Design a protein with these regions (language model features):
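Short, aromatic/basic amphipathic alpha-helical patches
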Residues: 203-215
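Short, surface-exposed amphipathic charged segments that create phosphate/polyanion-binding patches used
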Residues: 103-104, 185-189, 229-243
Length: 258
C-alpha cells in the first residue's frame, strides 16, 4: 500500500505520487514513481493470470512411493471413497514439503485442459483443513469434464464433486461464480441440481429465482445435514433422483423458512 498521512497537517492520500506533488518534489522523481505504480499493477495482473501446481507436487500415478506420507495420503482418499480411477482421472496428487506440505492436491482444469484452480486438503489432521492458492475462485470447477448438454450438479467442494461423479461442478465455496452463471446461460443448460448445505442454499436463492424465471428446471437437493462425501455415490444419487423439481411454492418456502 502507498497510503500516507501527515499527523501535523492531517493531510493524507492513497499514493506516493500525490505526496510528492504536494511537497513539490523534483519532476524526475515524480515521473519515476508515476511509472512505477502502473508497472507494478501490470506485473501483479500478469502473474495472477497463470496458475501452476506446487513445485513439490507428487502424482499418485506417475510418482508412486512407499513413504509414510504417500500411505497416509492414499488412505485418506480411500476412506473418502476416492479410488484409483478418480485419482487418475482428476490428476490428484500430494505434497510432502513446501507451502502445501502434508496436503492432498486436487487440480481443476478448464475446457482446454489448463489449470484454473486447485484445492489443498490436509491429510494429517491440521487445524487448517484447507490451504488454497491466492487466486480468484471465479472459475468453473472441473470444467474439463462437464457435459453442458446434460443436467449439471452444483456442490460446494471437490470431495463432494468426486463423490457425486456425474457432471458435478464444485464451487470452491458457498457462492456461485459469475463465470459459471454466464456459462450456464450461454450453454443453455436445461436442468440444475443444487447440492449445498443450508448456508450455501440461502446464498443461492436469488440465482434460483432467476433460473426458474428463465425456464431452467432447478432442484434443491436436501441431504439432511449430511454431505455427499459422507453419503457416498449411490446414496447421493438416490436422493438426487427422488428430488422433485423446485416449484414456485417451494421457492417461497425456502425464502421464508430456509
Amino acid at each position: 500500500s502507498q497510503k500516507w498521512h501527515c499527523w501535523v497537517c492531517d493531510k493524507k492520500g492513497r499514493s506516493l505520487y500525490t505526496l510528492l506533488k504536494l511537497i513539490r518534489a523534483p519532476k524526475a522523481l515524480i515521473d519515476e514513481v508515476r511509472e512505477y505504480k502502473p508497472n507494478y499493477k501490470r506485473k501483479k495482473i500478469e502473474e495472477s493470470q497463470t496458475l501452476y501446481l506446487p513445485k513439490e507436487f507428487k502424482s499418485f500415478i506417475f510418482d508412486p512411493g512407499n513413504s509414510v506420507y504417500y500411505q497416509q495420503a492414499y488412505t485418506f482418499l480411500k476412506d473418502r471413497g476416492v479410488d484409483a480411477t478418480e485419482i487418475a482421472r482428476y490428476g490428484i496428487g500430494y505434497c510432502t514439503e513446501g507451502t502445501y506440505a502434508e496436503r492432498i492436491i486436487i487440480p481443476s482444469y478448464d475446457k482446454d485442459g489448463i489449470l484454473n484452480y486447485f484445492t489443498a486438503r490436509s491429510f494429517t489432521g491440521s487445524n487448517y483443513k484447507y490451504k488454497n492458492p491466492p487466486v480468484s475462485k471465479d472459475v468453473i470447477g472441473f470444467e474439463f469434464f462437464v457435459n453442458w448438454n446434460e443436467p449439471i450438479v452444483l456442490c460446494e467442494g471437490p470431495f463432494d464433486a468426486l463423490s457425486i461423479k456425474r457432471n458435478a461442478i464444485p464451487l470452491f465455496g458457498k457462492t456461485i461464480p459469475t463465470t459459471l452463471i454466464k456459462r450456464i446461460y450461454t450453454e443453455r443448460v436445461k436442468e440444475i441440481y443444487i447440492v449445498l448445505d443450508e448456508d450455501a442454499r440461502q446464498d443461492s436463492i436469488k440465482l434460483v429465482d432467476k433460473l426458474m424465471k428463465d425456464g431452467i428446471k432447478t432442484y434443491f437437493v436436501q441431504l439432511q445435514d449430511k454431505d455427499p462425501n459422507e453419503l457416498g455415490f449411490n446414496k447421493v444419487w438416490d436422493v438426487i433422483h427422488s428430488t422433485n423439481q423446485t416449484s414456485f411454492s417451494d421457492f417461497i418456502k425456502h425464502r421464508l423458512y430456509g
